[in-house]
Amino acid sequence: MPSVISTDVLIVGAGVAGLWLNARLRRQGFSTVLVESASLGGGQSLKSQGIIHGGAKYALHGALSGASEAIADMPRRWREALDGKGELDLSGVRLLSEAHYLWSPGTIAGNLTSFFASKAVRGRVDQVKGEQLPPALQNPKFKGKVYRLAELVVDVPSLIGRLAELAGDSLLAGQHIEPLFEGDELIGLRVDGRDIHAQRIVLSAGGGNADLLNALGVSQPQMQRRPLHMVLVKGPTLKPLYAHCLGGGPKPRITVTTHPAADGQWVWYLGGDLAEADGVARQPDAQIAVARKELEALLPWVDLSQAQWATLRVDRAEPAQSGLVRPDNAFLDSQQRLMIGWPTKLALAPDFADRVLSQLSGDGIHPTPQAALSDVPRPPMAIPVWDELLP
């Protein structure tokens, strides 16, 4: 193996954002090296609910921000990729649900009026009843209203597996990362003692970007973390449900997605307002008690007597901005050879890749032939959180 590896683009951080970018670059003929310090998708990606949303929940205020516009095209782009016809061939990736749903438990229809009048959702929402209802809501006791959103839910472990296949021989496991300078110019990184020179270096390590920026002596952009305290429940009586349950506020009262556990049972993964500030402040036992009470109030016909429970704390990493508001698009900052980015949302991974490709094009960076990476350590796949926490 040569003492110095040369590549067009060196990417650090193999979550969905880094893996998607890597696959796009390789498809366009660029040589790449993608470095991961732990496991593929093991940071934020595999803790995500897998919802590829088009911003519908952001329009709940009736006030449409830039977010809904920027994110509106994402479901179409993902769907095309999953059909094997898009910017990447993701055919074979498991789709958990063709749609995500909005459900109002029957007491609150008020905030739906302005919501459906907003252009964010016009033409993208249909009311469903009877047999069209999600399986978990098909019960005579269910009195609410349910709307189908033109959004989809992917099985993130299967997505990571496919993106890892598309990475070919470009993946490299590496823990210790130092900058390589020529004079004052950053020309590459030293990864566990291996020197890698690159035309461009992209940091897409989510929460790991903070330490990387520190190691490179870069003070801007700064990162912020928005914490969540998610709840997982597994049981033989659970049926698939992919839905935002509306409360009175601008955020969904609870967001439920359903995932296949290794033992064949379904796991409900609960986020939404439940997992936000009040939930973050609770201890795990208290958070589980609140989640249980919510499910018993909203879905009283579901027998939870044999259910297993766990909670999971997740930090959403994103560029720092005033007021800890939600970022509206994938973020990319470019400083000579270095690009620093946060997609901020699973759904925005294609937008993140667009921004990097556009920057490469603007900088006149073109593919150059490079030798394949051989005889290097490869990062392992991460274990899905529901199998880790509820074995």
Predicted regions and their residues:
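A conserved short coil-to-beta-strand element within the FAD-binding core of flavoproteins
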Residues: 171-188
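Core beta-strand elements of the Rossmann-like FAD/NAD(P) dinucleotide-binding domain
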Residues: 5-7, 191-200
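Glycine-rich FAD pyrophosphate-binding loop
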Residues: 26-47
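Active-site substrate-recognition segment that forms the wall
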Residues: 203-335
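Helix-loop-beta segment of a Rossmann-like dinucleotide-binding subdomain
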Residues: 99, 129-170, 273, 335-343
